[in-house]
Amino acid sequence: MGKITSIEVQKRNVNRVNVYVDEAFTFACDAELIYKQGIQKDSIIDIEAIKEIVKEDEFIKCKNSALRTVEKTYKTEKELRDKLAEKGFEEDTIKRAIEFLKEYNLLNDEKYAEMYIKDRLRSQGRNKIKYALIRKGVSEDILLDKLSNIDTEDENDTAFKLAEKKYNILKKKESDKYKLSQKLFRFLLSKGYDYDCCNSIVRRLTNNEYME
């Protein structure tokens, strides 16, 4: 047990206060939290109450950090979890912050996958998109659902346009038709298009039988 002898607003951050128990600095926390907890000068406080306040303050800091992160750029749950862990927040605190954001639909892997696919389809095939989303922690169920909605004809049209542009650049530098075909094929593969799509487009553009 101890007596709160002083509550001082921090000079560098007016939203936080320093709390002194029995004349000694004991902890710092969010000013609003102090108000909500009904803590004031001359209040009696024990060590368990202090631990709970510090724990709740850590959650507030974690939540605010999470909010700032998703305000800058939308994240998957894994990306945000990793970001918060890098900042030193404990797993239980991170879990609470993530649940808070999910409750207000500020963190939604399904929505993220939809937006990511829509954006990347302008320049990438489904394979590259798929593996990028896997690295970002999107679940297999979400991936299967969202990738199945991709229009194959539209994807192939995009692949052809990208290949045509690349082909016009390559043919100015490469006179060997076999090498040209191989370079174009590898380019399309690197963009995430499947073998059959790449093979068909290369044959169509180069009008030859150099593809194996």
Curated annotation (Swiss-Prot):
Cytoplasm as UniProt keyword: yes
Keywords: Cytoplasm
Pfam family, one: RecX_HTH2
Assigned protein family: Belongs to the RecX family.
Chain's role: Modulates RecA activity.
Database matches in HAMAP family: RecX
Protein name per the record: Regulatory protein RecX
